[in-house]
């Protein structure tokens, strides 16, 4: 984030640690420190940049980076101290001095300076317990033999605490009004100023009383949690006395009451108040000890809670597992303790059929899942807000399965019994392709319309569009479903020429007319030759089948089949029946989300995926996120969408239909739903939606329109 003068943290640091510098350039070092104080996330970004520079193979660059770090610790205050005091950054410093990492390749000058900095921080920042732990571990491992001498000019002197400010008297409007009234010589203005001062003093007293009550509540909560936790550690069902059990029951009741008090405190506290973090931490500790009591004493099974998590120590430092862990140099050669990959669920997701044979490599659900690292820490560091939503929501939706196909003869009868009016060239229904010339392979009986609409290609194996000439399983307009192959037509005996019945000829006339319509729309249709080479699967008919067409089409010079020399295939693919995009395979784009609906705490956002589905560059993948920040539950949520006739829209099943009420100590509840939007004509997208839901007990129906979609030319590369 560039601030004044167009400088960013990275540019300041690059100039301050430039290897071509003859000496330390304090102008850029101080500029880097000032930039940290200006930016909201300055300390977090700074420690990441400094860790990279400190591990530089160039000694002078690493030494300058350590000088910058030392200056930042003196000038950037508590926010930077907290970031440096985390294991995430301390581990990077340990790697510099450890021979099992970079210690053998780093100069002694750099390693000595790192050790001096760590030792000086243990003296100047006793509240940062993790720095002390890291330094003592280095001493236990023999990397640090003795404490280094620290010159006075290198000693970290904590900056004085900022002057306490009174938020009541810092109100700019009231201060200006008070100054104007005091300058006035009108007695009425002076009386008004007196009343204003009294009201401001009362507000300040109320604020102080509120802060005092909050501190008292937090202290009482911490004492109860600590005492109950210690009693639970020493609890034994056989040897614990009744008095101990009564005391634990009393402490448990107090904790239950205090939890409601903390909820109220959190809801009354402003988001930018520093005490909100203390309230949330106390609430977490309270929830853990309550769940531990229910598990140990009452024998209840508490879902989703780790009852063995540690409580805060006497200094108030919580050693939770999610805070990271210090590198144990003594056990680096042992197998890592990373959490194993989650086993695939055994229920809820039906087994998918084998993938169809296509010319392109199939993509499976397992391959996309295997790319994700098993550890949750790296995932949390790499993912944005949208990634977290996609990982946490909607992953257990059952995948669509392909129903069994009926035998080929019954499919053929279904086709014959279908009225000719249902043969719509531009509809998503499958249409039988015209047969090839006499020496080409004969086409099998087409599948029924119902089987095409009910048996989409499994989500784990999206297949590319294949030319009509290739007798493979595909989901194109003129191809067959991804289900089992239809039964082969029986071998025709060499009898006299047979002609279809009158009803069959009626169907043939309709199909002939269909081909004529395809000829008229030649601007959109790209004919594909039946003899075009390409990877094909096994023939659908035996090689011994006679070489006459399955249907007696005329192939004279005037017939459309003769003129097109192949099966007509429509150019713009509109159907989305066979397109399914699993939520976990979606990659978020850099495009900003669009707010489609935002009323009464119920909000709907459109997030755009980075890539299009395989073989469908005209389809935009949209992840619809529904969030609830209202104090009431939202139920029976149904979202419907409509687009112009030249486009097609499809909504996949949502991850849920209900949203729980908003809680100030938990992230807002959310629902995700994947929406596919086909736009083969590359027109401007205008989408209308209908949203029905129940907010509390009130039913609502909302209509809206969204036209802020990414440019069509950028689809697939957002």
Swiss-Prot record:
Domain GAE: 589-710
PTM: Phosphorylated by CK2 and dephosphorylated by PP2A. Phosphorylation of GGA3 allows the internal DXXLL motif to bind the VHS domain and to inhibit the recognition of cargo signals.
One GO BP annotation of this record: negative regulation of amyloid-beta formation
Gene3D superfamilies in the record: 1.20.5.170, 1.20.58.160, 1.25.40.90, 2.60.40.1230
Lipid bilayer topology: Peripheral membrane protein
Pfam families, alphabetized: Alpha_adaptinC2, GAT, GGA_N-GAT, VHS
Keywords tagged on the record: Endosome, Golgi apparatus, Membrane, Phosphoprotein, Protein transport, Transport, Ubl conjugation
Gene Ontology CC: early endosome membrane; lysosome; protein-containing complex; recycling endosome membrane; trans-Golgi network
Sites bearing Phosphoserine, chain numbering: 159, 275
Protein's recorded name: ADP-ribosylation factor-binding protein GGA3
């Amino acid at each position: 984030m560039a601030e004044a003068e167009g400088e960013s943290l990275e540019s300041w640091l690059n100039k301050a640690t430039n290897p071509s510098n003859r000496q330390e350039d304090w102008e850029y070092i101080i500029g880097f420190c000032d930039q940290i104080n200006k930016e909201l996330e300055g300390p977090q970004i700074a420690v990441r940049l400094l860790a990279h520079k400190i591990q530089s193979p160039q000694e002078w660059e690493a030494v300058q980076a350590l000088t910058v770090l030392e200056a930042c610790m003196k000038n950037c205050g508590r926010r930077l101290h907290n970031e440096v005091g985390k294991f995430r950054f301390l581990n990077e410093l340990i790697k510099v001095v450890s021979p099992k990492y970079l210690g053998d390749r780093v100069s002694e000058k750099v390693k000595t300076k790192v050790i001096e900095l760590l030792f000086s921080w243990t003296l100047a920042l006793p509240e940062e317990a993790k720095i002390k732990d890291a330094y003592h571990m280095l001493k236990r491992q023999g990397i640090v033999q003795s404490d280094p001498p620290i010159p006075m000019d290198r000693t970290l002197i904590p900056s004085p605490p900022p002057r306490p400010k009174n938020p009541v008297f810092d109100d700019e409007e009231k201060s200006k009004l008070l100054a104007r009234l005091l300058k006035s010589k009108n007695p009425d203005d002076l009386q008004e100023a007196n009343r204003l001062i009294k009201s401001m003093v009362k507000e300040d007293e109320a604020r102080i009383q509120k802060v005092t009550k909050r501190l008292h509540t937090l202290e009482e909560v911490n004492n109860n949690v600590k005492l109950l936790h210690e009693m639970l550690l020493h609890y034994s069902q056989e040897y614990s006395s009744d008095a101990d059990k009564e005391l634990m029951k009393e402490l448990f009741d107090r904790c239950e009451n205090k939890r409601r008090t903390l909820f109220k405190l959190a809801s009354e506290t402003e988001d930018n108040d520093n005490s909100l973090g203390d309230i949330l931490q106390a609430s977490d500790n309270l929830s853990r000890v309550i769940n531990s009591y229910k598990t140990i004493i009452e024998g209840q099974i508490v879902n989703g809670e780790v009852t063995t998590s540690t409580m805060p120590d006497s200094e108030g430092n919580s050693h939770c597992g999610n805070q990271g862990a210090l590198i144990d140099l003594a056990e680096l050669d042992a197998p890592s303790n990373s959490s194993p990959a989650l086993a695939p669920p055994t229920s809820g997701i039906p087994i998918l059929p084998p993938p169809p044979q296509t010319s392109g490599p199939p993509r499976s659900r397992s391959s996309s899942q295997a790319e994700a690292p098993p550890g949750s820490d790296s995932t949390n560091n790499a993912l944005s807000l949208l990634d977290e939503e996609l990982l946490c929501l909607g992953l257990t939706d059952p995948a669509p399965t392909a129903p069994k196909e009926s035998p080929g003869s019954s499919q053929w009868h279904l086709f014959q019994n279908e009225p000719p009016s249902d043969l719509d060239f531009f509809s998503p229904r499958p249409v039988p392709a015209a047969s090839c010339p006499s020496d080409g392979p004969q086409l099998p009986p087409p599948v029924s319309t119902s089987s095409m609409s009910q048996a989409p290609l499994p989500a784990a194996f999206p297949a590319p569009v294949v030319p009509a000439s290739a007798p493979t399983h595909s989901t194109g307009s003129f191809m067959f479903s991804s289900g089992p192959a239809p039964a082969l037509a029986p071998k025709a005996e060499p009898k006299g020429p047979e002609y279809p019945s009158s009803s069959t000829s009626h169907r043939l006339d309709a199909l002939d007319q269909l081909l004529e319509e395809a000829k008229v729309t030649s601007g959109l249709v790209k004919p594909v030759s039946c003899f075009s080479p390409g990877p094909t699967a096994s023939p659908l008919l035996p090689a011994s089948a006679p070489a006459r067409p399955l249907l007696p089409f005329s192939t004279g010079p005037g017939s459309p089949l003769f003129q097109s020399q192949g099966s007509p295939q429509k150019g713009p693919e509109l159907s989305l029946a066979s397109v399914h995009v699993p939520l976990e395979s979606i990659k978020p784009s850099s495009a900003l989300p669009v707010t489609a609906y935002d009323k009464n705490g119920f909000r709907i956002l459109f997030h755009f995926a980075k890539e299009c589905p395989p073989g469908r560059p005209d389809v935009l993948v949209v992840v619809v996120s529904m969030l609830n920040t209202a104090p009431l539950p939202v139920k029976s949520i149904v979202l419907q969408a409509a687009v112009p006739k030249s486009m097609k829209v499809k909504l996949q099943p949502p991850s849920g239909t209900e949203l729980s009420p908003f809680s100030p100590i938990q992230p807002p509840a959310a629902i995700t739903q994947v929406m596919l939007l086909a736009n083969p004509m590359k027109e401007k997208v205008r989408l209308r939606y209908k949203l029905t839901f129940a907010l509390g007990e009130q039913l609502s129906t909302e209509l809206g329109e969204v036209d802020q979609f990414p440019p069509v030319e950028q689809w697939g590369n957002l």
